[in-house]
From Swiss-Prot:
GO cellular component: ribonucleoprotein complex; ribosome
Quaternary structure and partners: Part of the 30S ribosomal subunit. Contacts proteins S5 and S12.
A biological process from GO: translation
Naturally occurring in which organism (per UniProt): Pseudomonas fluorescens (strain ATCC BAA-477 / NRRL B-23932 / Pf-5)
Family from the record: Belongs to the universal ribosomal protein uS8 family.
InterPro entries recorded: Ribosomal_uS8, Ribosomal_uS8_CS, Ribosomal_uS8_sf
UniProt xrefs under Gene3D superfamilies: 3.30.1370.30, 3.30.1490.10
Keyword check for Transit peptide: no
Protein name: Small ribosomal subunit protein uS8
Keywords: Ribonucleoprotein, Ribosomal protein, RNA-binding, rRNA-binding
Length: 130
């Protein structure tokens, strides 16, 4: 069976692993998933990530906890295959008044909403993380 929305699957795996208090979660790798994992690491939401170099590459994400609670409180998919959400630089959403981040796919790569505003570019709002 083919996966319809690999990014939603990635976010669900992260959410489920954190609820189960796992330290590492693995999933099939893709360029978009690696780019999102890099943004999550740069923003401090995950401890790290690795890509295994097997026949079918796997992306392993090290989850991060603070005082026994997951660092990621909420992660939501915004743009989905059935309803893409494209926003201009002025329309990019702030998550919880700027405390969280929106991850945006732009023509300059995958970045946070703050980086997209600084670069003056809009794009597809992939997900929000708080």
């Amino acid at each position: 069976m083919s996966m319809q929305d690999p990014l939603a699957d990635m976010l669900t795996r992260i959410r489920n692993a954190q609820m189960a208090e796992k330290s590492v979660v693995s999933m099939p790798s893709s360029t978009l998933k690696v780019a999102v994992a890099k943004v999550l690491k740069d923003e401090g939401y995950i401890a790290g990530y690795q890509i295994s170099s097997e026949i079918k590459p796997l992306l392993s994400i090290e989850l991060k906890y603070f005082e026994g609670r997951p660092v990621i409180e909420e992660v939501k998919r915004v743009s989905r295959p059935g309803l893409r959400q494209y926003k201009s630089v002025e329309e990019l959403p702030k998550v919880r008044g700027g405390l969280g981040v929106s991850i945006v796919s732009t023509n300059k790569g995958v970045m946070t909403d703050r980086a997209a505003r600084a670069a003056g570019v809009g794009g597809e709002v992939l997900c929000t993380v708080f």
